[in-house]
């Protein structure tokens, strides 16, 4: 319905069809997908990612939050994007002194399986990601990219925030402290 306002010149041509990817995600059965990332499939898990290529600002906030995140009762799976992976992995390694509740990967190829096992998602607010999250009823913290046409990711995020289905952090307000406070 909200899209009709964006295409107000021809509202009769707007037709709701759904998102085929969202339907695929909704049929995935919960599996022990987290074990592939050395995480406990029985613990609450937060997935953090900034899209397939990663997002520097989200990654920076994650690194800043690491000292706090490793002390939490929940676990974190962080997908950094290929460009940022080695830097962030080395930050985590500097803190290594035992088993962590944080796993860092460059990319998640089995996202439908992972979505079916996590408790909360922190991500950008692209249309396909939000379709997948809403299909599964996953709570989310959305950080819209400020670098997209017509600020559509903010509009996408606000549609869920207005329905009390997500929280929103604007990228300029994102810090490690803000991330941890929001997750807690």
Task: State what each model feature region is.
Residues 1-31:
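Active-site-proximal region of nucleotide-activated glycan assembly enzymes
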Residues 2-10, 129, 150-157:
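Short, glycine/polar-rich helix-capping loops at beta-to-alpha or helix-loop-helix junctions
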Residues 3-14, 89-90, 95, 114, ...:
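Short loop/helix-cap segments at secondary-structure boundaries that form the rim of catalytic
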Residues 30-32, 39-120, 154-157, 162, ...:
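Donor-nucleotide binding loops and adjacent catalytic segments primarily
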Residues 1, 50, 80, 123, ...:
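Short beta-strand/turn micro-motifs composed of small residues
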Residues 1, 17-20, 143-146, 169-173:
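Short beta->alpha connector loops at strand-helix junctions that form conserved
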Residues 9-12, 72, 98, 136-137, ...:
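Short, structured coil segments at secondary-structure junctions
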